[in-house]
Amino acid sequence: MKRNNKSAIALIALSLLALSSGAAFAGHHWGNNDGMWQQGGSPLTTEQQATAQKIYDDYYTQTSALRQQLISKRYEYNALLTASSPDTAKINAVAKEMESLGQKLDEQRVKRDVAMAQAGIPRGAGVGYGGCGGYGGGYHRGGGHMGMGNW
């Protein structure tokens, strides 16, 4: 009985941690993985900088809920893996949900990249490539957004 109480308390603590800290990780200014900085291209004009900033701000606003959901699913996935008897079916279901969320974020990222190209902002000029490819510092994909002049 003591073990069940400890497991329940640990699960509640993990859930509270996931609910309270996820917003910080999904935040608009976390990290510099997908921020905007010059990478050897020609300098952007003031108009291009403003356009790029708006495109990035819109992208982060539009993907905020998706990024939060992905982080919550990662917490759930990790909790399922650390259970005393891991449920393979539940773990696989959560993994598929994470994959689906990742694909939705990829689609939004492509839309952002197309908007940047259509605005005449050269690839690599004023746009960071994301340290690990896209969604958030330690989460295998870039997600932090610091914006121009905010380093």
Swiss-Prot record:
Belongs to the ZraP family. Keywords: Periplasm, Signal, Stress response, Zinc. The keyword Metal-binding does not apply. It holds the Pfam family Metal_resist. GO terms for cellular component: periplasmic space. The lineage of its organism: Bacteria, Pseudomonadati, Pseudomonadota, Gammaproteobacteria, Enterobacterales. Its main location: periplasm. InterPro entries: Metal_resist. This is Signaling pathway modulator ZraP. It is found in: Periplasm. Part of the Zra signaling pathway, an envelope stress response (ESR) system composed of the periplasmic accessory protein ZraP, the histidine kinase ZraS and the transcriptional regulator ZraR. The ZraPSR system contributes to antibiotic resistance and is important for membrane integrity in the presence of membrane-targeting biocides. ZraP acts as a modulator which has both a regulatory and a chaperone function. The zinc-bound form of ZraP modulates the response of the ZraPSR system by inhibiting the expression of the zra genes, probably by interacting with ZraS. Residues 1-26 form the signal peptide.
